């Protein structure tokens, strides 16, 4: 399960950006073609957050649909796996244009009143 290491890296990046301020929420974008299982990230998140500024934070995951573009005719198509055939011309020469992402889209930190 490579999602454990990925989750640890996400938490390290967010904690570094938070600069010691407690984090309330983290939003990720995960592409359906990324080979990263969103449910596994959710499972690892609470465990990996323990003892960090992310402890108690909520995790929101936005799944990005897979899309491809035919290199022969330019048609854009939905992809549910990292390969397929063009709906228009039948070509297998597809370029993945969306769905392989893994992004930390945003994080929400607690307000600090001074």
Curated annotation (Swiss-Prot):
The keyword S-adenosyl-L-methionine does not apply. Gene3D superfamilies: 3.30.2320.80. Keywords: Metal-binding, Nickel, Zinc. InterPro entries: Hydgase_Ni_incorp_HypA/HybF_CS, HypA/HybF. Zn(2+) binds at residues 70, 73, 86, 89. GO terms for biological process: protein maturation; protein modification process. The keyword Zinc applies. Ni(2+) binds at residue 2. One of its GO terms (molecular function) is nickel cation binding. Transmembrane segments: none annotated. PANTHER family: HYDROGENASE MATURATION FACTOR HYPA (PTHR34535:SF3). Involved in the maturation of [NiFe] hydrogenases. Required for nickel insertion into the metal center of the hydrogenase. Belongs to the HypA/HybF family. NCBIfam families: hypA. This is Hydrogenase maturation factor HypA. It comes from Rippkaea orientalis (strain PCC 8801 / RF-1) (Cyanothece sp. (strain PCC 8801)).
């Amino acid at each position: 399960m490579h999602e454990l290491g990925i989750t640890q890296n996400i938490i390290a990046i967010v904690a570094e950006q938070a600069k010691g301020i407690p984090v309330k929420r983290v939003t990720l974008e995960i592409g359906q073609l990324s080979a990263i299982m969103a449910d596994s990230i959710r499972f690892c998140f609470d465990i990996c957050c323990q003892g960090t500024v992310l402890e108690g934070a909520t995790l929101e995951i936005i799944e990005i649909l897979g899309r491809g573009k035919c290199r022969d005719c330019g048609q854009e198509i939905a992809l549910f796996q990292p390969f397929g055939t063009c709906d228009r011309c039948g070509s297998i020469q597809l370029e993945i244009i969306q769905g392989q992402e893994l992004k930390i889209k945003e994080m929400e930190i607690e307000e600090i009143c001074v």
